[in-house]
């Protein structure tokens, strides 16, 4: 039976031949012959879209790398940092539905360009608080004169017998605190970071649904998956540079250019260190503004490829979409009125929600992104707290090792889809298999943790024994009972016995000296209390480093983390192609918009918040602001942090795997149903038995994938 590709597509959906003049999805698109000179502009659009993906991904990666810096600079808990991180998704939520639906019928490149401008200004707004806040003030021994290299010996411990009147000291201290409280207007400056990130979300809204749909509309079916894979790979390269930029800025002091760095007594390894977090946002904002330029020069539509021109729709869609071919104006039609476009909004939404494959994939992706958003947001903090690494090093290894593995995985997924021409079922199997294997590997990370740092009164007793029962007076002991110490300060000192003390005062140190930036404390009674035979009762400012075994565990963690990242990302492009192929072409942008909306609202906003709230429960020592309110966490329980962080990620990943299995089950069921319905309907057609015999072979050939009009995939 000789039919055109259009008629063959109609045969699968209407079970009858379609007249040659019937409507198809090519309505409104310029023909290949008409717009031949514009063919090269698809590559220009591909390059422009890749660059804007790079710019937005760089800013997102940089934001993740500055989570701990922002937490310390503004003295806020992890839960509030999670809300700031989620403001990007809130901005997306405000306009995503309308942008994805109406934007698909307007000038898509210009809408993307306008979004880039908003995104650029929002990114720069995040850096604004640095120029209006007071200089960063960390907890330090203020009696030391930073202008001198050697400081006379003073006693951190105010002995009862020799200290001046405590009332006079406390009076001066209270006056200072009261004055600082009046002038402390910087405590709410984090709101600008929230608003800037929200603007970033508003500006980013049109990029994914309109950009990917535009690319898929005008690329050949053979190249669509490859092009999308290229864009997604470039998008992963962005965070590499974002984390590397974050690593560089974390080494620079927050007030660089505003203070004399010779007077700074802490180093990047100190838990109170805050890097130049604001600097990277200025760079990322400029790149976003630059990315807007090419989109203002691109046309509203491009010529469709010859394969799309001939086929009109893909065979893969025909097996899973009920009645996909009906007349609707395509994105190329000009001057559609808003009311005309809005008329089909609810019917289109209803059509999407009646698609079981789309809904199940939406649920699976949402749960999986909850896992991924929470994991990525707090990964730098996890590396810092679990393995004792600096913020700069944590960002460096994520940017240089983890993210390239993700990029390679996404690119490999696109190559596999193109080379083996996988159908929807095979793509779903690859997506499911990568998730299962990836989360199984992730389980091994539970065994790669480190012991808690030995901190007197928090993780070990003052005698150095474990465990310690924490209570309100746990930081005080007989060895520091004669000292007038505050238990709210965090001025860590590493004793020669390998135990960290919350402050030199709580270590019972009676004398000290300074040479350059190094402060040596001596005659520390609590150090001798834990190691009475050593005879060396001294210590140095700063936390004690974790043992060498922890460094070895960190290397194993990196290896498993890289393999897991590659495995999970391998299913990214197959999953994306499943999303594009299970819906009607004219609803593609709208479906991508709803998908993005669901991921933003149900994963991007809540995941960092509830991850942060649960992580805060593992805090052992909170810092305090000038006015006495609670600030950011200074020390976490490593065991509790590990179980919360890894356990929650694994739990969500497991749920997403079961939902992905349901997607595959429904796909297979719909294919068998469509296949059987087609054969039954054909057998009812009034034909003579001789004609049936004559056309049987041709019909069987027609059911084989290579005879379907959209030959880009095979089941």
From Swiss-Prot:
* One Gene Ontology term from the biological process aspect of the record: monoatomic ion transport
Which sites does the entry annotate for glycosylation?
452, 523, 536
Which Pfam family is one of those matched by this entry? OATP
Disulfide links within the chain: 479-509, 485-505, 494-526
Q: Where in the cell is it found?
A: Cell membrane
Q: Which Gene3D superfamilies match?
A: MFS general substrate transporter like domains
Residues on the membrane's Extracellular side span 64-82, 135-187, 257-274, 374-393, 446-557, 616-649
Asked whether the UniProt record includes Zinc among its keywords, one would answer: no
Describe the location of the Kazal-like domain by residue ranges.
473-528
The stretches that face the Cytoplasmic side, renumbered to this chain, are: 1-43, 104-109, 217-235, 300-351, 418-421, 581-589, 668-715
Report TM segments. Answer: 44-63, 83-103, 110-134, 188-216, 236-256, 275-299, 352-373, 394-417, 422-445, 558-580, 590-615, 650-667
Its UniProt entry gives the catalysed reaction(s) as:
3,3',5'-triiodo-L-thyronine(out) = 3,3',5'-triiodo-L-thyronine(in); L-thyroxine(out) = L-thyroxine(in); L-thyroxine sulfate(out) = L-thyroxine sulfate(in); 17beta-estradiol 17-O-(beta-D-glucuronate)(out) = 17beta-estradiol 17-O-(beta-D-glucuronate)(in)
Q: Report the coiled-coil segments.
A: none
Chief subcellular location equals membrane
What does the UniProt keyword field contain?
Cell membrane, Disulfide bond, Glycoprotein, Ion transport, Lipid transport, Membrane, Transmembrane, Transmembrane helix, Transport
Q: What is this protein called?
A: Solute carrier organic anion transporter family member 1C1
Species this chain originates from: Mus musculus
What is the gene called?
A: Slco1c1
